[in-house]
């Protein structure tokens, strides 16, 4: 998977939000807010270019004190949400 180029993570007033740029922004009627951990995963996905749930889960385990099974479950949930919103 890959994050679509039209979406960018921004920190606005201490909050992480995903914003649309270019033509996608015309129909973008809501901001997508991310917590700190989700923002970390977004940044990791951007760095990786092509990413998988497994690669994000490994990065989560490397950065935070979390077991792989929980990291995979959490990453599956956030990636599913990103897919639902059309971000990846």
Question: Model-predicted segments: where are they?
Answer:
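Long, charge-rich, low-complexity alpha-helical segments
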Residues: 30-88
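Acidic, low-complexity/disordered tracts enriched in E/D and polar residues
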Residues: 1-40
């Amino acid at each position: 998977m890959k994050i679509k180029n039209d979406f960018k993570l921004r920190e606005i007033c201490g909050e992480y939000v995903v914003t649309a740029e270019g033509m996608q922004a015309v129909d973008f009627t809501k901001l997508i807010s991310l917590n700190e951990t989700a923002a970390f995963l977004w940044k990791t996905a951007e760095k990786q270019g092509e990413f998988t749930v497994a690669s994000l889960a490994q990065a989560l385990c490397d950065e935070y004190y979390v077991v792989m099974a929980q990291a995979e479950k959490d990453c599956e949930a956030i990636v599913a949400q990103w897919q639902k919103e059309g971000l990846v």
